[in-house]
């Protein structure tokens, strides 16, 4: 019995140390450069713009604007086809956020950008509310925004991670338990 337990333990350790990699495609997605639906979408977009351009005289401002839009559309599709983005059956690029490092650029930079900007907005809002709470009529200042004060606070908000860390260290970021009101139930 001890030998059997040892073999089970050994096989479990070996399986957990050397797992087989499962290399499956990601939900039927293909590289955009190899996707027929992606090419079809490009042709349909360009054709639609060319039909609109046919309604105007060559060289007229609307025709020139549509020609520029066609060039931008082709450049966008070309950029997607040169990248490692994967397209679905609809021909649209899909972002993969499953932890694979090969798709990190698709999600990490936009994700950090979103977190930074939303943190900036939240930090500036918090700082504004704390600043107007010391005025003689704070409720009115919350409804009717003091634009010069708000702009001043917004321009300093880009360093919100440093400010948040400093307030966290000085115990000014989190309210004390005595300051938090609890409604009786």
From Swiss-Prot:
GO terms for cellular component: chloroplast thylakoid membrane; photosystem I reaction center. Residues 1-24 form the signal peptide. Pfam families: PSI_PsaF (PF02507). Disulfide bonds: none annotated. Keywords: Chloroplast, Membrane, Photosynthesis, Photosystem I, Plastid, Signal, Thylakoid, Transmembrane, Transmembrane helix. It comes from the Eukaryota. Its main location: plastid. Gene3D superfamilies: Photosystem I PsaF, reaction centre subunit III. It is a multi-pass membrane protein. It is found in: Plastid, Chloroplast thylakoid membrane. GO terms for biological process: photosynthesis. The chain crosses the membrane at residues 104-124, 143-163. Belongs to the PsaF family. Probably participates in efficiency of electron transfer from plastocyanin to P700 (or cytochrome c553 in algae and cyanobacteria). This plastocyanin-docking protein contributes to the specific association of plastocyanin to PSI. This is Photosystem I reaction center subunit III.
């Amino acid at each position: 019995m001890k030998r059997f337990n040892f073999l089970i333990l050994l096989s479990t350790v070996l399986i957990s140390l050397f797992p087989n990699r499962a290399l499956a495609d990601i939900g039927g997605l293909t590289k955009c450069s190899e996707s027929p639906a992606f090419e079809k979408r490009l042709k349909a977009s360009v054709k639609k713009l060319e039909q609109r351009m046919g309604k105007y005289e060559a060289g007229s401002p609307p025709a020139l604007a549509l020609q520029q839009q066609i060039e931008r559309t082709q450049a966008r599709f070309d950029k997607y086809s040169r990248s490692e983005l994967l397209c679905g059956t609809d021909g649209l690029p899909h972002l993969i956020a499953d932890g694979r490092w090969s798709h990190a650029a698709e999600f990490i930079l936009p994700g950090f950008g979103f977190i930074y900007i939303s943190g900036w907005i939240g930090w500036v809002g918090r700082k504004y509310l704390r600043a107007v709470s010391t005025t003689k009529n704070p409720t009115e200042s919350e409804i009717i925004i003091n634009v010069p004060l708000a702009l001043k606070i917004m321009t300093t908000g880009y360093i919100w991670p440093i400010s948040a860390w400093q307030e966290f260290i000085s115990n000014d970021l989190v309210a004390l338990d005595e300051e938090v009101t609890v409604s009786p139930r």
